């Protein structure tokens, strides 16, 4: 492969490398950022900062050192499927727990 061909691909330094925002994984950063933005627009800066920190700690405690994929899988199996229809148009309902071949 030449230099131009390699530019098409992304090679992570480690296998566990994942996208991060300010050092936080996306599943921890996005809920906290939403709360911070809400607090910014409603001018409740300190309240939103405290709530964002609490949400961040709750997500970290729920994960218990597991990966982000574990949290996504837990949400798929235990939360209503309608929550995922926004992102995933074709996703089977989690109540159908048997694989169909």
Curated annotation (Swiss-Prot):
InterPro entries registered for this protein in UniProt: Pilus_assmbly_TraL (IPR016382), T4SS_TraL (IPR009838)
Superkingdom of the source species: Bacteria
UniProt keyword terms in alphabetical order: Cell outer membrane, Conjugation, Membrane, Plasmid
Location (main, coarse): membrane
GO BP field: pilus assembly
Signal peptide residue numbers: none
GO CC term, one of those recorded: cell outer membrane
Compartments, as annotated in UniProt: Cell outer membrane
Statement: the UniProt record of this protein carries the keyword Membrane: yes
Pfam families: TraL
Membrane topology: Peripheral membrane protein
Function comment: Membrane protein involved in F pilin formation.
Xref: NCBIfam families: TraL_TIGR
Name assigned to this protein: Protein TraL
């Amino acid at each position: 492969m030449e230099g131009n061909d390699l530019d098409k691909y992304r090679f992570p330094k480690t296998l566990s490398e994942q996208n991060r925002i300010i050092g936080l994984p996306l599943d921890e950063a996005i809920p906290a950022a939403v709360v911070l933005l809400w607090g910014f627009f409603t001018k409740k800066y300190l309240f939103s900062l405290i709530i964002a920190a609490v949400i961040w700690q709750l997500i970290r405690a729920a994960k218990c050192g597991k990966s982000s994929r574990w949290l996504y899988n837990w949400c798929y199996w235990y939360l209503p499927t309608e929550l995922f229809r926004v992102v995933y148009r074709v996703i089977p309902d989690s109540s159908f727990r048997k694989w169909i071949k």
